[in-house]
Amino acid sequence: MNKHERLDEIAKLVNKKGTIRTNEIVEGLNVSDMTVRRDLIELENKGILTKIHGGARSNSTFQYKEISHKEKHTRQIAEKRYIARKAASLIEDGDTLFFGPGTTVELLAEEVNHHTLTIITNCLPVYKILLEKQTAHFRVYLIGGEMRHITEAFVGEMANAMLEKLRFSKMFFSSNAVNKGAVMTSTLDEAYTQQLALSNSIEKYLLIDHTKVGKEDFTSFCQLNELTAVVMDYEDEEKVETIKTYIEVVD
């Protein structure tokens, strides 16, 4: 096994297991401890994994560092637009909707082209998009509170107090990661605000692209089997089938 093949095999092992110990790689590939340590450094420099005490952790498994709102706008744009169009087809005139934060939901806001809607959001970019469409019959409300600047979403006591009083026919939201049936985000504040909106919604639709499946983040705020359906792209059929073991995926 040459170096290129060895690096590829280590990357596959760590991505499959999430975390792996150095001695597992040594025994599995029949190479020296020093060779494995050098390989882990090289793979860490390439952004594939993160070295931890006694081994390594996959960067594709744990969303340990939340990326900026600006950077999210550059990732999986075609997939997100596909998801947004699918989600828009689920909206009917007369609906009262809650839109959560996220770039996919922002694209959904661009797709919405209905005559009579009431939309409530705690996300400033979503609100700005929808505000341009506001009419006497297309009403848009922004929930205020403490802003999380990385997502430009309002959370905290003020936002939650407003949400507790509201009811929605449908909720559309996204997440940073989905794994083993759990839907996850990066902070407890955002998780609690999402939970409140979910508890006050009749239909609940999660919008995720395939790269979110199999990852983990800091905290879960709901389970897939509590939702109405998931709207996602079909770039990775295996991940779609994984989601279908828990909940319907919109065709």
From Swiss-Prot:
What keywords are assigned to this protein?
DNA-binding, Lactose metabolism, Repressor, Transcription, Transcription regulation
Record has DNA-binding as a keyword = yes
DNA-binding region range list: 20-39
Secretion signal span? none
Q: Where does this protein come from, organism-wise?
A: Staphylococcus aureus (strain Mu50 / ATCC 700699)
GO molecular function per UniProt? DNA binding; DNA-binding transcription factor activity
Against SUPFAM superfamilies, the record matches this protein to:
NagB/RpiA/CoA transferase-like (SSF100950), Winged helix' DNA-binding domain (SSF46785)
Q: Which Gene3D superfamilies match?
A: 3.40.50.1360, Winged helix-like DNA-binding domain superfamily/Winged helix DNA-binding domain (1.10.10.10)
- Domain HTH deoR-type residues, every copy: 3-58
Protein's recorded name: Lactose phosphotransferase system repressor
Role noted for this protein: Repressor of the lactose catabolism operon. Galactose-6-phosphate is the inducer.
A GO BP term, please? lactose metabolic process
Q: Does the keyword Zinc-finger apply?
A: no
Gene that this polypeptide is encoded by: lacR
- InterPro entries reported in the protein's UniProt record: Carb_Metab_HTH_regulators, DeoR-like_C, DeoR_HTH, NagB/RpiA_transferase-like, Tscrpt_reg_HTH_DeoR_CS, WH-like_DNA-bd_sf, WH_DNA-bd_sf
